[in-house]
């Protein structure tokens, strides 16, 4: 019998744990460093959104623009690569932002937002765990999307179970 242990962390932490031999396979949201890794990209992508209380004036909008967020207290993801992606989206306005918090877990950012502490910027998939009666999300416009990769370290011996799992993953490439 094979038992799989799931561990939730930022991509940077999982990457470090893989390089220390503590984790065999990682599931990463891009952008991610894939140096020294073999991987497959999952074809579905996820959209970036901003969360707010349902009675917030921004909740009436179909989508949220850079200008909508300039004076708002934002809760951004902790990952530097993601912050860089968002800096690119905000462009010259990035330095004008009020970044109230950074968070390594979207659900924590959601809890902070329900208490009026900020507007979490997150991938849409993470917001599925927010209670819609307390927090709604709107997509960013222009849209930003992110793909997911499943990765493992290149050229190292794995257990039979991990090797078989990697074979199954690679079957998706064909």
Where are these regions (language model features)?
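Beta->alpha turn/N-cap motifs
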Residues: 10-11, 27-32, 53-54, 105, ...
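Short helix-loop capping/hinge motifs at secondary-structure junctions, enriched
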Residues: 55-65, 142-144, 155-161
